[in-house]
Structure formats: structure tokens, C-alpha cells
């Protein structure tokens, strides 16, 4: 078997979609696990992660079925959808890597003041910090109502904004890097699907069109 032939392209496309299926199931499983253990309280975050996992699973199943059956229509739509996902994911990944510390601070500030008091309290206890940044008139109010453990162990607690910035910077780099990696695997998937779709099945009727 020559690599680049019908069987090789089929096996490579099947393997790539199996990887996508495993990643999607992992996303769904991690979201359910995080909700079950109470690590993430926001139903919107859980729902978003599960939705992404289900969407990726559907794409992977369509690609796998199209590859196994050499289904022209499925492979065509698989290429189109995967190409659109690549563009979207590439832009988002580059944006994650391009966000500077000043922009992160603005986003954290804006998010903090639209949160409910319950959510703020959960974050303060989770990160063991009090208040956001000591640059606002409401910081002292946040600090007074803070219930984090650090408040009873030391005279002052670290500001949550500093911890959020540290974690957000790490998270954005990881998300951007992983997103770029998967975006290039999606381009590989589009190329494999296009190549495989235009190859003739050696087991098919020689007079049939592809």
C-alpha cells in the first residue's frame, strides 16, 4: 500500500476523527465531572463546554461515517464545516495570545462588577483572596464582606485581581497554544477529506464516477 493511496487516506481520516471523538468525549466528561464535584458553579460555563463537546462529536461522527463509506455529500459538508471551524478557532486562538495585561485587567474589572455577590464570595473563598484591585472605592466594601480563610490568618489578604491576572495569563497562553495546534489539525482534516473524496474506491465499479 502506497501512503497517499485510497486506503492510506481513508485510515488517516478515520484516525483523525477518532481523535476528535475522544477529545469531545473528554470535554463532556470534564464538564460533567466539574459540575458534579462543584468545582464550577456556573451552569453557563458547563453548558458551553458541553455544547462545544457535542458539536465536535457530531463533526467527528460525520467525518468518520463519510470516511468509512466514502460518502461524497458527508465529506463535502465535513470539509466546509471543518474549514469554518478552523477560521473561527484560529482567530480566537490568536486573540487569546495577543491579549495583553492591561486588556486582561479591563476584562476582569468589567466581569467582577457584573457578578452577583454570591459568585464573588465563591471566587474569594476558592482563590483565598479578598477584593479585586485596591484602586476602587468599592474595594474596602468588598474586603469587609470577604469570607476567605486568609482574612482570619493574616492582617491583609492578597487582592483577587492579582491572582486572577496570574491565572488568566496562564490560561490564555494554554488556550491559545492548544487552539492553534487543533486549528492546524483541522486544516489537515480538510486536506485529507478533499484528497480522499477525489480518490476512486478500488473496490467500486470502475465505470462509476468516484
From Swiss-Prot:
Gene that encodes the chain: TSPAN31
Major location category of this protein: membrane
Cystine crosslinks: none
Family membership: Belongs to the tetraspanin (TM4SF) family.
GO biological process, one term: positive regulation of cell population proliferation
Residues carrying covalently attached carbohydrate according to the record: 100, 109, 117, 134
Keyword Metal-binding (UniProt): no
Keyword annotations from UniProtKB, A to Z: Glycoprotein, Membrane, Transmembrane, Transmembrane helix
Source organism of this protein record: Homo sapiens
Cytoplasmic topological intervals: 1-12, 66-72, 195-210
Entry annotated with the keyword Transmembrane: yes
Parts of the chain on the Extracellular side: 34-44, 94-173
GO cellular component, one term: plasma membrane
InterPro entries per UniProt: Tetraspanin/Peripherin (IPR018499), Tetraspanin_animals (IPR000301)
Record membrane topology: Multi-pass membrane protein
Record-annotated membrane-spanning stretches: 13-33, 45-65, 73-93, 174-194
Ranges in a coiled coil: none
Subcellular location(s) per record: Membrane
Entry protein name: Tetraspanin-31
Pfam families: Tetraspanin
Amino acid at each position: 500500500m502506497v501512503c497517499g493511496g485510497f486506503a492510506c487516506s481513508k485510515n488517516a481520516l478515520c484516525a483523525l476523527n477518532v481523535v476528535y471523538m475522544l477529545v469531545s468525549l473528554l470535554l463532556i466528561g470534564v464538564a460533567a465531572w466539574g459540575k458534579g464535584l462543584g468545582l464550577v458553579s456556573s451552569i453557563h460555563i458547563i453548558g458551553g463546554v458541553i455544547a462545544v463537546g457535542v458539536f465536535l462529536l457530531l463533526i467527528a461522527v460525520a467525518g468518520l461515517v463519510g470516511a468509512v463509506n466514502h460518502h461524497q455529500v458527508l465529506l463535502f459538508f465535513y470539509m466546509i464545516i471543518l474549514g469554518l471551524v478552523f477560521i473561527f478557532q484560529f482567530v480566537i486562538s490568536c486573540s487569546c495570545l495577543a491579549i495583553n495585561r492591561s486588556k486582561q485587567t479591563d476584562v476582569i474589572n468589567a466581569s467582577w462588577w457584573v457578578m452577583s455577590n454570591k459568585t464573588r464570595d465563591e471566587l474569594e473563598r476558592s482563590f483565598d483572596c479578598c477584593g479585586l484591585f485596591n484602586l476602587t472605592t468599592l474595594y474596602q466594601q468588598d474586603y469587609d464582606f470577604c469570607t476567605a480563610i486568609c482574612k482570619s490568618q493574616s492582617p491583609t489578604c492578597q487582592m483577587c485581581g492579582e491572582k486572577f491576572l496570574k491565572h488568566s495569563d496562564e490560561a490564555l497562553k494554554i488556550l491559545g497554544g492548544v487552539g492553534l495546534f487543533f486549528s492546524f489539525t483541522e486544516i489537515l482534516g480538510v486536506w485529507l477529506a478533499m484528497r480522499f473524496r477525489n480518490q476512486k474506491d478500488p473496490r467500486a465499479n470502475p465505470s462509476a464516477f468516484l
